[in-house]
Amino acid sequence: MLKRILAALSIGIAAPVVSSAPAAAQSPAATMLDAEARQDVVAKVSAALRERYVFPEVGEEAAAKIGSALAAGEYDDLADPAALASRLHADVAAIAHDKHLRIGAMNAPSPAPAQGPAPSYRAEAGVVRADKLAGGIGYIEVTGFPPPDFFKPVLDKAMAGLEGSETLIIDVRRNGGGSPESVAYLVSFLIAADQPVHINDIVTRVAGTNDFARESFHSLPTPVSFAGRPVYVLTSNATFSGGEEFAYDVQALERGLLVGEITGGGANPTGPVEIGNGVVATIPFGRAENPVTKTNWEGRGVEPDVAVPAADALKVALERLGQTPVADIAAASQQQVFAPRSVPLAGSEAAVRQLVAGATSGQPDYGAMTDQFADLTRQHLSRAQTMFAELGELRSVTFREVDMMGGDVYDVAFANGALVMAVLLGPDGKIAGGSISPSAGPGS
């Protein structure tokens, strides 16, 4: 029961915080699906496709395909939620060809990386490091675009450290995306601040209709500016979503040279849909539209101006700038001017204890949360209360690390088990995000 609740909570309340628990520890036991449950899953996925998918005709076609497959008995042997989800994903992907559209199972283990474990690194609000290199070159690596309230202060600090650089290298080779508003803010450092520049639009489908709404993103004033200075953007085939948007925007505005690989090819913003029966889905509800090109990079990726293997992108950029060509930023750096925070924010441990106490009693302090996080907490309160009742008395809260999005991660021990809890505090000190996952230790 506890593992099942944890799965629901990790899906439901994970806001901008990324859980740090190993994937293997997050796999609850599967509950087999009977015919009625399979029918319910297909019905809910179909409804989400018809009502929310950004391209209504494609959503209708995909929904019809899985409905026909169900009626033909093609899913009759798929009692395991992971097996059903995998087949549904394959059937829908064959129609939509959308990398942001995903159907999966809570109990499915994460696949092992094809080339061994991914290299570990620390980031704060998506910023890994900023360095001054020889030749007046500034370097910054950005691996994600969290909401602007969290991204801006960290980016401002990192970019201030690069002030005076004659050339800028921005590394998004490991960037998986995020907020389009934060993408626009990073672009803002590269363009003149005399008047706002239209950077990107997100065209969103109004759920249940064929109507669309448009949100435009423009440049904003920045504390330092690199307008008019040469810019190099490093890309890889792992650069995705918002990371791709940044590269695409820079290219469309003719504000930099892209060096590296064609990016992943995902331009449609997505959101979670509650399916139930151990199945989860993310359904793209919008599309990016660049005001210069009137299109985006969906399905194609962003073409670099200088195509080289991602591992060589920094080396090639440095060589083009007349510097010693090295692939490792640590070797190229003369001075690291920004490093991620490695200690918890004041108040984050108290926030974790407050969340535990509120969920245990069934009376959270919603006034200590942002409105969005308070709404999510209300939705999942009964499950959280059941979980904490099973865990028993709180014994200890021990800081572990700062996660990639700037959340503080803690090991939380109880009388009957342990959790990994992350909490994200907003600029006003309110709890703005959080996640719960099993501990990797004994008894988890």
What are these regions (language model features)?
Residues 383-433:
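Surface-exposed, charged secondary-structure patches
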Residues 107-110, 144-148, 174-180, 196-197, ...:
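Solvent-exposed loop/turn segments at secondary-structure junctions
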Residues 8-17:
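Bacterial N-terminal signal peptides
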Residues 56-135, 376-386, 392-398:
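Extended, small/polar residue-biased N-terminal targeting/export presequences
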Residues 177-230, 268-274, 286-291:
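Gly/Ser/Thr-rich loop/hinge elements
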Residues 45, 92, 140, 170, ...:
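Terminal peptide-recognition signature
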Residues 62-68, 355-377:
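Short, well-ordered alpha-helical segments enriched in acidic and aromatic residues
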Residues 29-41, 325-358:
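Short, low-complexity N-terminal intrinsically disordered segments enriched in polar/charged residues
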